[in-house]
Amino acid sequence: MKSRLLFLGPPGAGKGTQAARLCNANGMSHLSTGDLLRSEVAAGTALGQEAEAVMNRGELVSDALVLAIVESQLKGLSSGGWLLDGFPRTVPQADALEPLLDELKQPIEAVVLLELDDAVLIERLLARGRDDDNEAVIRNRLEVYREKTSPLISFYRDKGLLVSVEANGSVEEITQRITKVLS
């Protein structure tokens, strides 16, 4: 199974849930930029306060801030594979990530794109009840996602790394689909 992965998909597609399942089953490190940012916010750090204001508007945190967090996490890993969830989200972020991965001799092996309908996404996001999940913010996040991430999908498709997975259905069904495309 491939062990250096990126997960792409709109908010609510199940990236975090599926990443955790895949990592637990295969001894990989799950690097979720959303979780890392939320922990900075909870700790009340300067970076956390900056990130909180941006996230509350449904916008993306700066590339420099997220890349610094990701770099620190990747350099801190002892061994085994990893799964990046929530980064990169834009082509400039992907361009910034590549030299770091080259330096670490850990190139991406596959990019998993989780796809599903907006109605299901909105329903899932409202149901999970996070503070930054209200319908106006969710719709803005979906718009930002499409605007920023569509070119990234093409970027990884052109590199032959992209695999699409239908993210409707039960958690277990989606996990099985992902495992199948990565084997």
Curated annotation (Swiss-Prot):
Sequence positions that bind ATP: 12-17, 128, 169
Group of enzyme by EC: transferase
Keyword Transit peptide: no
EC number(s) from the headed UniProt entry: 2.7.4.3
Molecular-function GO terms, alphabetical: adenylate kinase activity; ATP binding
Annotated segments matching region NMP: 32-61
Residue sites binding AMP per the record: 33, 38, 59-61, 86-89, 93, 130, 141
Cellular compartments per GO CC: cytoplasm
Catalytic activity: AMP + ATP = 2 ADP
GO biological process: AMP salvage
Domain notes: Consists of three domains, a large central CORE domain and two small peripheral domains, NMPbind and LID, which undergo movements during catalysis. The LID domain closes over the site of phosphoryl transfer upon ATP binding. Assembling and dissambling the active center during each catalytic cycle provides an effective means to prevent ATP hydrolysis.
Assembly description: Monomer.
Protein name listed in UniProt: Adenylate kinase
Organism of this sequence: Parasynechococcus marenigrum (strain WH8102)
Gene from which this protein is expressed: adk
